[in-house]
Amino acid sequence: MSDIALTVSMLSLVAVLGLWIGNWRIYGVGLGIGGVLFGGIIVGHFAQRYQLDLNSDMLHFIQEFGLILFVYSIGIQVGPGFFSSLRVSGLRLNAFAVLMVLISGLITAAIHKLFAVPLPIILGIFSGAVTNTPALGAGQQILTDLGSNPSQIDLMGMGYAMAYPFGICGILLVIWLIRLLFRINIDAEARDFDSRNGHSHELLQTMNIMVRNPNLSGLSIQEVPILNSDTIVCSRLKRGDFLMVPLPTTQIESGDLLHLVGQKQELENARLVIGEQVDTSLSTRGTELQVSRVVVTNERVLGKKIRDLNLKQRYDVVISRLNRAGVELVAGNNATLQFGDILNLVGRPQAIDAVAAIVGNAQQKLQQVQMLPVFIGIGLGVLLGSVPLFIPGFPAALKLGLAGGPLVVALILGRIGSIGKLYWFMPPSANLALRELGIVLFLAVVGLKSGGNFIDTLLNGEGVTWIGYGILITAIPLLTAALLARLMIKMNYLTLCGMLAGAMTDPPALAFANGLHATSGAAALSYATVYPLAMFLRIMSPQLLALLFWSV
């Protein structure tokens, strides 16, 4: 069997064994995707014992490409809501991430000085304890630049392997302990996130208001500023027994009933200006109007603003809501359409059919993946990650690397949505498949590489001591941040899990956190919010530690 065929076979074995281990449940908690790492350690141990020759270049490529696939798909998933989340809670989340990085760095420095642990080994333990492979590479590079002995630099990998397993398990354990300690109800936390954090757009409300302000009588909809804004949509107007879709030029009369859609505060402002709230139903039942949901799939309308389609004047149809990546937005005139947007239409059946034909509404297109944008995004991400950042006093340039670059690019492209005929929308099933494939490949290779000398170092060397150091570097920052976040500011549990995973730059922990609730995107959103800064700080930390203690 060729070395390539053998390598693929071993990776498949690792994936099967690891996923099986990940499905084991102890008190309802399992390793999930993190089980692949331990499957890799087991297979790696026996591979070395029986002297199986695996292709190292192929393993290196698979490890890096798997990580790229994972972080890219995460970025595309959370991109549409990332920047709004950053405005709402990004400062607070990133403050906790910085706190965790700072504490882990201080503990590492203390262990190095108090126990005289060689610098290459403690930097390897640090990288493994915070589950950051790019930090390992950055540490090895700066030690090389500083003239360290190559044999000592190789010890970094062993320290990394000793600390990495608990780095993976430690965050899962903390997530589990916080859940038990505070008696967390996952469904309640998901609902709380939807109502309070970033998804407040989802809870768009409606209000029926009767026109009582005499100053509005005779004015058209577009002449009333509160009704001609991007924060409120007037989707129906009832005059007597007649229900209609109001046009911008439709004149308002005293006694008219307006059905408005928007956020609560905006609706209250409209009520103060227009008149009084009434409980009268403005349902389309029994009328010639109907409400339908259509999806944007026509490439010709991508990037166009709602006002450019002129649907009210041409078809007497109004878009009352716009759902993008699970977040409901007010369909203001300046809202730009993206592939996969779901539009809530109100109008006559024939007119709605005509509008549906314009925007596409081709459900089968939602299951198709444009591969060209995927590889454009990955390529741009790798280029960004390779750009060196020179800082005075640093002998080596800092880089976002193959994990940070693709994530940042994916966040931006996910937010943009489309450029011309290229769209970065990815069906949830395809996104999940890429994400899971990527993390399985990454962990399988890390496990295989760590497994060879893992048992020997654990039993006959200083492995147990190194693991103890790693536990301190892993557990203390996690517990400190988790308890402070939950006790001081009552942080949502799912958001907390994503923040911890992001601050540890730990994809398996994110996969575990995502699995806590089937539909909530809270963990992924907070992960992506803190990940770019955390990744930068994690890469910079071993370089700072090396510079501080090299000549001391």
From Swiss-Prot:
Q: Say yes or no: keyword Repeat present.
A: yes
Q: Where are the transmembrane segments?
A: 4-24, 26-46, 65-85, 90-112, 158-178, 371-391, 403-425, 439-459, 464-484, 493-513, 530-550
Q: Where does the record say this protein resides?
A: Cell membrane
Q: Which source organism does the UniProt entry give?
A: Edwardsiella ictaluri (strain 93-146)
Protein name stated in the entry: Putative transport protein NT01EI_3867
**Occurrences of domain RCK C-terminal (ranges):** 191-276, 279-361
State the similarity comment. Belongs to the AAE transporter (TC 2.A.81) family. YidE subfamily.
Signal peptide from the UniProt entry? none
Q: Which GO terms describe its biological process?
A: potassium ion transport
Please name the GO terms that the record assigns under molecular function. Answer: monoatomic cation transmembrane transporter activity
PROSITE patterns, per the entry:
RCK_C
Q: Which UniProt keywords apply?
A: Cell membrane, Membrane, Repeat, Transmembrane, Transmembrane helix, Transport
- Per the record, the major location class is membrane
GO terms for cellular component: plasma membrane
